[in-house]
C-alpha cells in the first residue's frame, strides 16, 4: 500500500442475538468505506440482517463502536439495529464439545464474504489448499486453480514462483498476490482455500469486476453475484404460462371466455341510461315556464274572445280538402260552347 494511507483492517462481524451465525469477514479501507454510515450499509448486506444495522458492539462487554478508527485489525464485533445488545457467546469455541463434534477454532473465522468468490473451508492439518487466481487487468481469461501443499504455503517466495509459472503475465513475474479488494498478501497463512485472488506483476493493481464477469453464477455460493436477467427469466416463463391459461377457455364456461390475441380485459356491457323522471308540480303551479304571479302591466285587462269573423291561418297540411269545379263553371257561362267548338280542329270525313 502507498505510504501515508491507513492500512486495511480485517474484521469479523456477527449478527446480534444469533449464536449460530458463523460471522462475516470484511476488509475495511478508507477508500472503500469513507464514513461509518457506508460501512454499516455493507455490514447489513454481509450479515443478512432483517433490518438495517445501526450500531456495532464488542462481543464480550457490549461496548459500542462509533468510529471507523476504533476498529481493530482482526477484531470481532456484533452488528445490531435499534434493539439492545444481546450478550451471547458469539466467539467460536476451542477444541471439541462433549458430543464429539468439532467446533470452530479461536481467531477470525473463515466465512462467506459477498465480495469473495467462495466459502472458506478449514481443512485438516497437512491437507493441500486450492485457490483461484485471476490475472491482473485481464477480463477475458478465466481464473485458474492452484494447488498449494502445506510446505509450499509456508514459503511465500515459492508461492510467487508457482504463480509466475502458472499465470504467465505479460508484465513478467508475479510480484504480489492481492485480494479482490486490492489488499496485498505477505504470507501463505493468509490464503484461504476456495477463495479468489488476483496475481499482480510490476504494475499496479487494477480494480475490475473479475468475479462478476469471469465466474459463472452456478459456481458461486448463495448471496453472491448473479448475471443480470437471471431473476427475470422465471418471471417471464410464469407470465407466459399465465397467458396460456388465460387464453384457454375452461370446460365449465366455454361460451363466456373467448381467446384474445392481445389478452385484453373483457369489456363490461354499457348500461343504458335510465329515463329522466317526470316532474310533478304541486297544485296551483303551471310549470317551469309559467309565472306564479300576474304581471303589473296586464292587471285589469280582459281576454278578447274569438267570434265568427275572426280569421285564422292554418297550415296547409291541416286544411280540409276542397273539390274545385272548374269545368262546370265554364259550361254555365253564355257563349262558352261556341268558343270551344270553334277552337276545336275539323276532323277529316
Swiss-Prot record:
It comes from the Eukaryota. Residues 334-349 have a biased composition (Low complexity). Keywords: Repeat. GO terms for biological process: intracellular signal transduction. PROSITE patterns: DC (PS50309). GO terms for cellular component: microtubule; microtubule organizing center. Residues 9-91, 129-211 form the Doublecortin domain. The keyword Repeat applies. Residues 222-258, 329-349 are annotated as: Disordered. PANTHER family: DOUBLECORTIN DOMAIN CONTAINING 2, DOUBLECORTIN DOMAIN-CONTAINING PROTEIN 2B. This is Doublecortin domain-containing protein 2B. It comes from Homo sapiens (Human). The gene is DCDC2B.
